[in-house]
């Protein structure tokens, strides 16, 4: 598979995946639970979602790691597990995606308002 850079330079239009949170809720994620923790506790759900988007023609699949910052994970009792969760999210997608698409990291906010604003 050509790299992202090569594909963009060639003017190729790329299609991304969709809403991971909605798909994970349909697979049992409860309100208030950390979707990022599923990278450890239920990687099969990630495989199912990625397969749906791949079958729909996505060229870019994002990791299940939007809220996997240390500060955000702390709120869910997952202190010190950010690296483990992020690595698991990437590894799971690399296995399922293989050479069918590109894997992109999803990086969200910390979940906290930091000084001087908060």
Q: What is each residue range found by the language model?
A:
Residues 1-118:
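Domain-level signal for soluble alpha/beta catalytic cores
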């Amino acid at each position: 598979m050509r790299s992202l850079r090569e594909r963009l330079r060639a003017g190729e239009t790329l299609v991304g995946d969709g809403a991971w949170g909605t798909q994970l809720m349909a697979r049992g994620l409860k309100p208030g639970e950390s979707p990022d923790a599923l990278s450890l506790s239920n990687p099969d759900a990630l495989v199912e979602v990625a397969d749906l988007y791949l079958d729909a023609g996505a060229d870019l699949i994002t990791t299940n790691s939007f809220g996997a910052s240390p500060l955000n994970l702390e709120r869910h009792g997952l202190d010190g597990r950010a690296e483990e969760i992020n690595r698991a999210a990437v590894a799971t997608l690399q296995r399922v995606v293989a050479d069918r698409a590109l894997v992109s990291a999803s990086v969200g906010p910390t979940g906290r308002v930091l000084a001087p604003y908060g």
